[in-house]
Regions:
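Non-catalytic, polymerase-adjacent accessory regions of viral genome-replication enzymes
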Residues: 1-54
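Active-site-proximal segment of RNA-dependent polymerases
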Residues: 4, 88-145
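Short, compositionally biased low-complexity segments
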Residues: 11-27, 58-62, 89-94, 172
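Non-catalytic, well-ordered alpha-helical scaffold segments
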Residues: 15, 42, 46, 80-89, ...
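Glycine-/proline-rich flexible loop or hinge segments
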Residues: 23-35, 64-74, 98-102
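Heme-based O2/NO sensor domains and their adjacent alpha-helical segments
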Residues: 44-61, 67, 71-75
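Conserved polymerase palm-domain catalytic core
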Residues: 51, 122-201
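Conserved pre-motif C helix in the palm subdomain of viral-like polymerases
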Residues: 70-100, 182-201
């Protein structure tokens, strides 16, 4: 029986992730890593498949950069972004079956438009006196890794996949020559962050 890291869907998910990356980075600068990855995709895919089978895959360090608005953002290498997208696609079926139907960020749930439509329907059927929108400041920056891994295990995610997610969470972030391993938080600059069930610290 194939393991969670060598099951047939992985090949299709890597191809889907490759198509996504090519589209998302279609206007990237000539020096962006996506162009080297596109040029050597067959070799990269074979290497990723082998590293998955051998459980030797590791993420590169993540660059912390400042955006035009002054915010700090983590920038992943092209290959790591592709792999995280493939991992997200691989996890979606398991998480979609077990997470609340109100989690509209999951694939097939309608996203922001679906959430807005649900609120409109609710207001139409039973008009409330007030509607409030809230957000917890620093919530994602304070996600506890051990709590997240425990929730993923309870949801039935295979241990080898949780190990990969742990490498993603405990990423090595670099800025101005300094390196720091992340002890908490998830990276919101990756395609994987929005697919996870977020437990509080």
């Amino acid at each position: 029986m194939p393991s969670a890291l060598t099951a047939p869907p992985w090949s299709a998910h890597l191809e889907q992730a490759f198509a996504w990356l090519c589209h998302a980075r279609r206007e990237a600068s000539p020096h962006h890593g996506v162009w080297r990855l596109r040029d050597k995709w067959d070799h990269v895919k074979a290497q990723l498949t082998e590293e998955l089978a051998n459980r030797t895959f590791r993420f590169s360090s993540v660059k912390l950069t400042r955006t035009a608005t002054g915010d700090l953002m983590e920038c992943w290498e092209a290959q790591d972004s592709l792999f995280l997208k493939a991992l997200t696609l691989h996890l979606q079926p398991t998480l979609s079956r077990k997470l609340s139907p109100s989690c509209y960020h999951l694939q097939g749930r309608g996203g922001v438009k679906g959430a807005i439509q649900q609120i409109r329907d609710w207001i139409t059927c039973d008009p409330p006196r007030f509607v409030a929108r809230s957000d917890a400041k620093g919530y994602y920056a304070n996600i506890g890794h051990s709590s997240l891994f425990r929730v993923l295990g309870d949801l039935g995610v295979d241990p080898p996949l949780i190990t990969l997610i742990s490498h993603y969470c405990r990423r090595l972030v670099t800025r101005d020559g300094y390196y720091a391993e992340q002890k908490k938080s998830i990276s919101m600059g990756s395609p994987h962050g929005c697919s996870l069930p977020f437990p509080p610290r």
